[in-house]
Amino acid sequence: MDIKHHQNGTRGQRRKQPHTTVQRLLTWGLPVSCSWFLWRQPGEFPVTALLLGAGAGGLLAIGLFQLLVNPMNIYEEQKIMFLYSLVGLGAMGWGTSPHIRCASLLLVPKMLGKEGRLFVLGYALAAIYVGPVANLRHNLNNVIASLGCTVELQINNTRAAWRISTAPLRAMFKDLLSSKELLRAETRNISATFEDLDAQVNSETGYTPEDTMDSGETAQGREARQAPASRLHLSTQKMYELKTKLRCSYVVNQAILSCRRWFDRKHEQCMKHIWVPLLTHLLCLPMKFKFFCGIAKVMEVWCRNRIPVEGNFGQTYDSLNQSIRGLDGEFSANIDFKEEKQAGVLGLNTSWERVSTEVRDYVYRQEARLEWALGLLHVLLSCTFLLVLHASFSYMDSYNHDIRFDNIYISTYFCQIDDRRKKLGKRTLLPLRKAEEKTVIFPCKPTIQASEMSNVVRELLETLPILLLLVVLCGLDWALYSIFDTIRHHSFLQYSFRSSHKLEVKVGGDSMLARLLRKTIGALNTSSETVMESNNMPCLPQPVGLDARAYWRAAVPIGLLVCLCLLQAFGYRLRRVIAAFYFPKREKKRILFLYNDLLKKRAAFTKLRRAAILRRERQQKAPRHPLADILHRGCPLLRRWLCRRCVVCQAPETPESYVCRTLDCEAVYCWSCWDDMRQRCPVCTPREELSSSAFSDSNDDTAYAG
C-alpha cells in the first residue's frame, strides 16, 4: 500500500509541474527569473539571496521596532540600541537562514492565532481601562467630591445661621464694652455724690466716742435684757439713731455748760463793778442761779422722743452703699462658646475634612496603581512578541521533526497523487467518505470545517469573559451616569435664611439712676434684619457620559478579538502554506505519509470505526427525557438537533436514511456510510466477520494543531 517517492525528474521539469497552489499562482503571475529564484536549489544565487534577504529582514525589523519597542516608556538611547540590534539580527537571519525567514513569516498566521489574540487582548484591556473604567473612576471621584462639598455647605450654612442669629447679642455686648469709659465716669460721679452722705453718716462730730461707748453699753445692756445675745450688734439704723441721740445730748449739755459759763462770767463782771462788800454779794446773787440752765434738759427729752431719722434709713443706706461699692469694680463681658465633639465609630473622632481627604488620597493611590498596572501591561504586550516568535520557531521545528504534526491537509500534491493512482488503476481516496472528511481539512474551502470548528468554538468561549466584562462595565457606566445626571437635574436646593428683630427698652426720668439705666439697659435697644441666600449648585455632581466614539474605541478591540477567533482557522492553514514554501521536500514527505496513512485506515475503516459506532448506538438506544420528545413533536425547528443521527458520520436522520433491520438494533446510517460499511452493520455483526486488518485504534493519528 505504501507509495515510494521517486525523484527522477530534471530541475526544469519540477518547475513545470508545481505541487502547490501557491507555486502555481506565483509561477503564473511572476517572471520566469523570479520563479527560478523563489524555487532555487540550495546554493543557487547566494549573493542575491543574501542581499535581498538582508534588506527584507532589516525592513521587517524596523516595522517590529515601530510596533513593539517604540511605544515602550524607555530612554531614547535604549530604543536606539534595540533598533540597531533588531535590524542587525533581522538582516543577518534573513540573509543566511531559511529557518529564520520561515519563522519570521510565520509571525503573520501566529498573530491570527491564540498568540495574536493574547496581544490583542492586552490592547482590549487597555481600551476598556481608558474608556469605561476611566469614566467610572472620574464619575465616582466627582460624586465623592460632591458629597464632601454638600456636607461642607451644610456646615457653612449652619455656621452662618448661628452667626447671624447671635449677631444682635454680640453687638449689644460690644456696645456695652465700647461705653465702658462713660459708665465709669457716671459711676465716679455717683460715688463722689455718695461720699458726702457717707461722710455724714460715719461722722463723729457732735458727740464724743466715750459717750458712744457709754451710751452703746447702756443701750446694749437695755437691749440685752430684751433680746438674745446673738443680736447685740447694732445695725446701721440703730447706730445712726444712737449717734443722733448723742448729738442731741451733746448739744443740750453744751448749752447747759455755756449757760453756766455765762452766769460765771456775769458774776465776775458784777463783782468787779460793785465794790461795796455787802451790796456786792446781794446784787450779784442772781448771777449764782445756775440751776436755771437745767431747763435745757427738757429739750433733750424732746429730741430723744422725736429723732428726725426715717425708719428704713439704715437699710436704704446699706443697699446704696453696697451698690456704690459694686460700681467701683471693673466692667467687662466675655462670650464663651462650648463645642462638644462626639466620637464616631469605635471611639474615633475624625472630622469630615479628614475623612474626605483620606478618601481622596485612597482614590489617588488606586489611580496610581492602575496607571502603574497599565504601564506594566504595555511592557507585557511588547514582551508577548517573544511568545509569538517562540511559537513560530516551535511550529517550524515540529513541522520538520514530527511527520504527524498538523498533517491533516488535503493539498494539491495530495490530489496529484490520487490522480496519478487513478490513472494507474490503483485504489484511490478521493472523494473522501463523510467520516473521513471530519478528520481532514481542505485548505481551499472558504468555510470553517469540522476539524477546525471545535477549536474555534473553544476560542470564542474564551473570548466571552472579556466581552461580558466590556458589556458589564459599559452598562454600569451608563447606569451610573444616568443616576448621577438625574441627581444633578432634580437635586437643586435653594437655601434661604431670614432673620429680623427689634428690641426697645425705654427708661424715663432725669435722675442719676435713670441716666445710669439708660446707659446700661439702653444698650439692649437693637434692631436688625438679615437675609441669607444660598444654593447647592456648586456641589451638584457633574457626571461625564461616554459618547458613541468612546464606546466604539472600547468595542473595536473586542470585535477584532472575535474576528481573530473566526480567522484562526485560515491563519493556521496559512502557516502550513508558509512552511511548505520554505521546506518543499519535507512537505512532499508529509503528504505521502498522510496519503499512505489514510489508505491504511480506509482498508480497516469498518473495524477502526466499530468502537465509536457501538458507543453512539448505545447512546441513541438510551431512553430520552420526556421533554426532548415533546420538543421533537411540537417544535419543527428543533427536530434537526433532537432527531437520531448516523452512527458513522453523525449526520441527521432523513427519510432516505437506512435503519438496521436486525431485532433490537435499529442503528441509523446514511446511504453513503452504509455503502462504506459494505452494507453490514458493525453493531449487530460479530467482530470476526468484519474486514480484518493489522491496524487498530491508535493514539498516533494525525491531529489538528491548535
UniProtKB/Swiss-Prot annotation:
Reactions catalysed according to its record? S-ubiquitinyl-[E2 ubiquitin-conjugating enzyme]-L-cysteine + [acceptor protein]-L-lysine = [E2 ubiquitin-conjugating enzyme]-L-cysteine + N(6)-ubiquitinyl-[acceptor protein]-L-lysine
| Zinc finger (RING-type) stretch | 646-685
Q: Which UniProt keywords apply?
A: Cell membrane, Cytoplasmic vesicle, Glycoprotein, Immunity, Innate immunity, Membrane, Metal-binding, Transferase, Transmembrane, Transmembrane helix, Ubl conjugation pathway, Zinc, Zinc-finger
Induction note: Induced by IFNB1.
Report how it sits in the membrane. Answer: Multi-pass membrane protein
Functional pathway: Protein modification; protein ubiquitination
Task performed by this protein? E3 ubiquitin-protein ligase which mediates 'Lys-48'-linked ubiquitination of STAT2 and induces its proteasomal degradation thereby negatively regulating type-I-interferon signaling. Essential sperm cell-surface protein required for sperm-egg fusion and fertilization.
Q: Which EC class, in a word?
A: transferase
Q: Which GO terms describe its biological process?
A: fusion of sperm to egg plasma membrane involved in single fertilization; innate immune response; negative regulation of type I interferon-mediated signaling pathway; protein ubiquitination; sperm-egg recognition; ubiquitin-dependent protein catabolic process
Its recorded name reads E3 ubiquitin-protein ligase DCST1
| GO CC aspect terms | acrosomal membrane; plasma membrane
Q: What is known about its subunit structure?
A: Interacts with STAT2; the interaction results in STAT2 'Lys-48'-linked ubiquitination leading to its proteasomal degradation. Interacts with DCST2.
Q: Which residues lie on this side of the membrane: Extracellular?
A: 70-79, 137-372, 485-553
Q: Which gene encodes it?
A: DCST1
Q: What is its EC number?
A: 2.3.2.27
